[in-house]
């Protein structure tokens, strides 16, 4: 597994390489290697996406993953530099728990989740991965959780109540 730093492109989207895997196919003449790359991309203001790319060469796999990440971005409502509420989500046997944190806490999370929060613009969060720590499953579980994020305004509108009643 390899890691790379955050790269910012001209359009302001940050990209971070989370994992690179090597696979081998055994053929008559020996082994043929392939690579898969997992990349997260975000604008630093609540938009984030992830992509998986596969190719025979590492740079090609990273390029494909980056394109997929940019194509599949979601918008997550943030509360300043943290989350609105605690979230628990599961994908396969990876369960992630994300909690909002007070100012100055920083990003306390595992490698795969840390990359997501950094490119998304979250600066204060507590996150824990329970069960499998497979980076692909952790990223998918994190995205499932982030899709569940709701603002107090949207919760109040769904319940037909005033925001003051919800925030209590």
From Swiss-Prot:
Any single biological process term in GO: translation
PANTHER family membership: MITOCHONDRIAL RIBOSOMAL PROTEIN S5 (PTHR48277:SF1)
Pfam families registered for this protein in UniProt: Ribosomal_S5, Ribosomal_S5_C
Coiled-coil segments: none
Organism field: Coxiella burnetii (strain RSA 493 / Nine Mile phase I)
NCBIfam families (alphabetical): rpsE_bact
UniProt record similarity statement: Belongs to the universal ribosomal protein uS5 family.
Keywords, comma-separated and alphabetical: Ribonucleoprotein, Ribosomal protein, RNA-binding, rRNA-binding
GO molecular function: rRNA binding; structural constituent of ribosome
Protein name: Small ribosomal subunit protein uS5
Function: With S4 and S12 plays an important role in translational accuracy. Located at the back of the 30S subunit body where it stabilizes the conformation of the head with respect to the body.
Keyword rRNA-binding: yes
Ribonucleoprotein listed as a keyword: yes
Oligomer status and interactors: Part of the 30S ribosomal subunit. Contacts proteins S4 and S8.
GO annotation, cellular component aspect: small ribosomal subunit
TM region(s), chain numbering: none
Free-text comment on this protein's domains from its UniProt entry: The N-terminal domain interacts with the head of the 30S subunit; the C-terminal domain interacts with the body and contacts protein S4. The interaction surface between S4 and S5 is involved in control of translational fidelity.
Domain S5 DRBM: start-end pairs: 13-76
């Amino acid at each position: 597994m390899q890691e790379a730093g955050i790269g910012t492109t001209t359009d302001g989207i940050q990209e971070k390489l989370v994992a690179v895997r090597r696979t081998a196919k055994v053929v008559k003449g020996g082994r043929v290697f392939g690579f898969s790359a997992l990349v997260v991309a975000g604008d630093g203001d609540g938009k984030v996406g992830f992509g998986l790319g596969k190719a025979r060469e590492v740079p090609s796999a990273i390029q494909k993953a980056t394109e997929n990440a940019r194509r599949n971005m979601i918008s997550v409502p943030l509360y300043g530099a943290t989350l609105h509420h605690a979230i628990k989500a599961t994908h396969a046997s990876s369960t992630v728990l994300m909690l909002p944190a007070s100012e100055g806490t920083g990003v306390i999370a595992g490698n795969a989740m840390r990359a997501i929060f950094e490119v998304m613009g979250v600066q204060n969060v507590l996150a824990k991965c329970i069960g499998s720590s497979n980076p692909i499953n952790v990223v998918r579980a994190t995205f499932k959780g982030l899709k569940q994020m709701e603002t107090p305004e949207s919760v109040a509108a769904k319940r037909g109540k005033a925001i003051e009643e919800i925030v209590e």
